[in-house]
A protein has these predicted regions:
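Structured alpha/beta reader/binder surfaces that contact nucleic acids or chromatin modification marks
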Residues: 2-166
Length: 166
């Protein structure tokens, strides 16, 4: 059983699908990016959970699920207290802010811009990355999620996913 299949088993087939641009997904697939930064996080799922990556059609993207990973944990970064003072003064970053910048491949200015209105950013820890190729309808989706959404897979779906992993 792969870690992805284990994550699906832990959550009785419940998983998450994210929409992600080609440039960021390439960094995940290559192992360069180990933290996916989002303004929200799933609360109704247990760790580890499976994350399927829908590559958007922007900039020549595939427009289908082309990757998956296991999320073992989610870190939090308060941009107002964890980034703001450092961004303004150019001081050394705190441990969590440094981790977000180093592992997400996002510089401090972009991170601050992304999170300064909501305040809190969530860093989804990426592990066990797998390449696969699935159309959205195979995961019972009619359209790509705006950011992310839950999906529920049955035993046949999980078997199809396992067969699609390269």
């Amino acid at each position: 059983m792969t870690s992805l299949e284990n994550a699906l088993a832990v959550n009785a087939g419940k998983a998450v699908v994210i929409s992600i641009k080609r440039e960021w997904l390439s960094k995940i697939m290559s192992g360069e990016k180990n933290l996916e930064v989002r303004k929200s996080r799933p609360w109704e799922i247990s760790f580890p959970f499976a994350v399927f990556c829908y590559e958007t059609k922007a900039n020549g993207g595939a427009g289908e699920i082309i990757g998956a990973f296991t999320c073992e944990d989610i870190d939090q970064l308060n941009c107002l207290t964890g980034l703001s003072p450092y961004y303004a003064d150019g001081e050394k970053l705190s441990g969590m802010a440094d981790k977000f910048i180093r592992e997400s491949c996002i510089d401090i200015a972009a991170l601050f811009e992304y999170g300064n209105k909501t305040g809190m950013l969530y860093g989804w820890n990426i592990s066990n990355v797998r390449k696969l190729s699935l159309p959205l309808h195979q995961l019972h989706l009619k359209r790509a999620p705006q950011s992310w959404q839950y999906i529920n897979l049955n035993a046949n779906d999980i078997e199809s996913v396992a067969a699609a992993i390269q």
